[in-house]
Amino acid sequence: MSQAAPLSHDEELFLKLLSCALHSELPEARDFTGLEEASWRRIHRLATSHAVPAFVGDRILTLPKEALPNRDMRLMIFSEIELTRRGNAYLTKALGQLKKTYEAAGLPFILLKGLSLGCFYPDAALRSGGDLDVLFHSDADYERGNELLRKAGHKLHDDSEVRYGHTAFTYGRTIVENHARAVFFDHKRHNRHFDALVQEAISSGSLITQHHGDYTIKTLPHELNVVYIFIHLFFHWPHWGVGFRQYSDWLLMMTRLKGQLDEEKILSMAKDLDILYPMQLFAQAAIRYLRVSPEIFPFPLLLQDDPHTEQIIRDVIHSGNFGFAQRPIKAQNKWVTNWRKFRFKMRRSRRLYAITPTHASRIIWGSVFGHLMLMIRRRR
């Protein structure tokens, strides 16, 4: 990656607030006393673009009166916190309904990421909700699940990749994503390896049971989930970028599970999937910029400061949630849009090659092939 400019003062303040949220600490009033309105707007914009407005906003509202932002900003933050709480309550209810639907049809599933990660947060209701991602135990169950939602009248999204194990349906006020596979690496051998790990967890009965309201749900075993949540972060990062919600998910999970994880198992999986060095870089960045304890990481850390660490944190800050803050602007002509995307990914793959050569080398061709297949399927 190219040499990055130093963090701005507002970016540093945002990271301080995020760090306080991660550690359930109160922010230092002196850092924010007399802060200009323009700086508060930039901090709030960062929190929003990274899908952590309630998580960070909750810390802002703990500041003493002299350090708080103006009244309008405070009301906006309070509203975002309440909306996030209501959104999570709705997701919990929708997941319960979905579980009943699938259970009645004899379709067991695993809840991936999203709502299953709230339990690792200091306050689960402050994690910004997303979609409901479910992983079926077999391809046949996945196909039956898709057909069940179609027949129930739920709209299948046009960008769904049905044959490749990923569909999205409108489900009330949220989206249900059905998965036949948990991961979508550009290297098929990595997909096959992770699929085998999931099937082993299912057959061995080692899935984790979580309680959500008045029902229970199954999630991946903790070691596999730590690797999976990083894969989710990592999959988006080389292509477009990734934000602090995904980063926080990973850090808080390891914080809560400190001392309970099989480190050798995680190290073995990380090596087999060629993601150990990126994991170590993201860990070092969290230690340096978010005051995360080195003791939470269940894998060997880098022994020296790595020059890529600062670029990692800068890239995450610029990316926003799933990279939307830095994606190329959409043009009226789809070919112009595709060309902009191609150029963006070409430059990005060159910058990231030193960090992850195995995966960065496939960014361009995997994306080109994926776009072509989507266009062909739409014409059909």
Which ranges hold each PLM region?
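Conserved NTP-donor binding/palm subdomain of two-metal-ion nucleotidyltransferases/polymerases, i.e.
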Residues: 2-130, 136-380
